[in-house]
């Protein structure tokens, strides 16, 4: 009966028969809630560490991808440059070939003219020898 009167007044006895303001059941629930909150905070901390690690990993991969992209762009530009150099060299060689063909044609014409002169001179010599 004394417990009932004290209970109505908001006072309770715990398992050690100590006088408490809170109901022992509420006290137990409060302790459990406090432990659950502590576990939750610990898990949130672990989650943040994991997420932080993942963010660092993604950042590192992004940097590596950017570096590889820049290397690829550089290689592509180098290939374009080499292709342009080869094209210019090819044009120079074609111009040189055309020049050499023209020179060859001049030499051929000159050779034919010299052959004609030689034939005329040989004919003249032959006529001169026969007249004597």
Curated annotation (Swiss-Prot):
GO terms of biological process kind: cardiac muscle cell differentiation; centrosome localization; cilium assembly; cochlea development; establishment of epithelial cell apical/basal polarity; establishment of planar polarity; inner ear receptor cell stereocilium organization; intraciliary anterograde transport
UniProt keywords, alphabetically: Cell projection, Cilium, Cilium biogenesis/degradation, Coiled coil, Cytoplasm, Cytoplasmic vesicle, Cytoskeleton, Differentiation, Golgi apparatus, Spermatogenesis
Protein localization: Golgi apparatus, cis-Golgi network; Cytoplasm, Cytoskeleton, Microtubule organizing center, Centrosome, Centriole; Cytoplasm, Cytoskeleton, Cilium basal body; Cell projection, Cilium
Entry keyword annotation includes Coiled coil: yes
Tissue specificity remark: Expressed in almost all tissues.
Coiled coil start-end: 74-114
Record flagged with keyword Coiled coil: yes
GO cellular component: acrosomal vesicle; centriole; centrosome; ciliary basal body; ciliary base; ciliary tip; cilium; cis-Golgi network
Principal subcellular localisation of the protein: Golgi
Family annotation (InterPro entries): FT20 (IPR028172)
Region of interest (IFT57-binding), ranges: 70-132
Molecular function GO terms recorded: opsin binding; small GTPase binding
Pfam families: IFT20
Subunit structure: Component of the IFT complex B, at least composed of IFT20, IFT22, IFT25, IFT27, IFT46, IFT52, TRAF3IP1/IFT54, IFT57, IFT74, IFT80, IFT81, and IFT88. Interacts directly with IFT57 and KIF3B/Kinesin II subunit. Interacts with IFT88. Interacts with CEP83. Interacts with SPEF2 (via C-terminus). Interacts with CBL and CBLB. Interacts with TRIP11. Interacts with TTC21A. Interacts with SPATA1. Interacts with USH1G. Interacts with CCDC146. Interacts with CEP78; regulating IFT20 stability and localization.
Biological role stated in the UniProt entry: Part of intraflagellar transport (IFT) particles involved in ciliary process assembly. May play a role in the trafficking of ciliary membrane proteins from the Golgi complex to the cilium. Regulates the platelet-derived growth factor receptor-alpha (PDGFRA) signaling pathway. Required for protein stability of E3 ubiquitin ligases CBL and CBLB that mediate ubiquitination and internalization of PDGFRA for proper feedback inhibition of PDGFRA signaling. Essential for male fertility. Plays an important role in spermatogenesis, particularly spermiogenesis, when germ cells form flagella.
Protein name, as recorded: Intraflagellar transport protein 20 homolog
Organism: Homo sapiens (Human)
Lineage, uppermost ranks: Eukaryota, Metazoa, Chordata, Craniata, Vertebrata
Gene of this entry: IFT20
């Amino acid at each position: 009966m004394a417990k009932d009167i004290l209970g109505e007044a908001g006072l309770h006895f715990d398992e050690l028969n100590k006088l408490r303001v809170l109901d022992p059941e509420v006290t137990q629930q409060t302790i459990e809630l406090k432990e659950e909150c502590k576990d939750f905070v610990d898990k949130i901390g672990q989650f943040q560490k994991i997420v932080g690690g993942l963010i660092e990993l993604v950042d590192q991969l992004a940097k590596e991808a950017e570096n590889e992209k820049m290397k690829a762009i550089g290689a592509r530009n180098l290939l374009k440059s080499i292709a342009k150099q080869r094209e210019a060299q090819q044009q120079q060689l074609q111009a040189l070939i055309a020049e050499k063909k023209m020179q060859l044609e001049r030499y051929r014409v000159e050779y034919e003219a010299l052959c004609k002169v030689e034939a005329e001179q040989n004919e003249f010599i032959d006529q001169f020898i026969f007249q004597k």
